[in-house]
Curated annotation (Swiss-Prot):
Ranges where the SCP2 domain occurs: 44-156
InterPro entries found in the cross-reference section: SCP2_sterol-bd_dom, SCP2_sterol-bd_dom_sf
Top-level lineage group: Eukaryota
Annotated GO CC locations: cytosol
Protein name: SCP2 sterol-binding domain-containing protein 1
Annotated S-S bridges: none
GN (gene name): SCP2D1
Length: 156
């Protein structure tokens, strides 16, 4: 944030700029609109819609590599606000909102800020899991395959 503004004026055609004309600014105030990168419950929706598009395009390849159904319960303040399923076991793959239609192989319960950091590559999934930042039930080792899917999506 700026601390001061320097004004330079030219009074007459032959004169140079007038020196020492600064405007000192007081302490900055908080913006009325929150920072655009602040996490809200709506940030996961475009991410999953984009992942869904990726699965539609390369899903058959992912089904061969992964062969699993993942359910992600996104939480905020300890309550589930979004539930998404990434089915990479049946057909050519699918991503949809809601609980898994068939039994999920792995269920992740993860706070939204942690999910966003993981998906953006700012946090190591193994370290976050071991630190207790999110919970996994079912086949825990399949989480490594989901991590590869997310990395593949990030390159896409």
């Amino acid at each position: 944030m700026w601390k001061r503004i320097d004004h330079q004026l030219k009074i007459k055609a032959g004169d140079g700029p007038q020196a020492g004309q600064f405007k000192e600014l007081g302490p900055g105030r908080e913006p009325a609109v929150p920072h655009p990168l602040s996490l809200s419950e709506f940030q996961t929706v475009p991410v999953f819609e984009d992942i869904s598009q990726h699965v539609k395009e390369v899903g058959s390849q992912l089904v061969k590599k992964v062969n699993a159904i993942f359910q992600l319960d996104i939480t905020k303040d300890g309550k589930t606000v979004h539930q998404w399923t990434i089915d990479l076991k049946n057909g050519s793959g699918d991503t949809y909102r809601g609980p898994a239609r068939l039994p999920a192989d792995t269920v992740f319960t993860i706070p939204e800020p942690v999910f966003m950091e993981l998906i953006l590559g700012k946090m190591n999934p193994q370290k976050a899991f071991l630190a207790g930042k999110f919970k996994v039930s079912g086949k825990v080792l399949l989480g490594q395959k989901l991590e590869r899917v997310f990395k593949d999506w990030a390159k896409w």
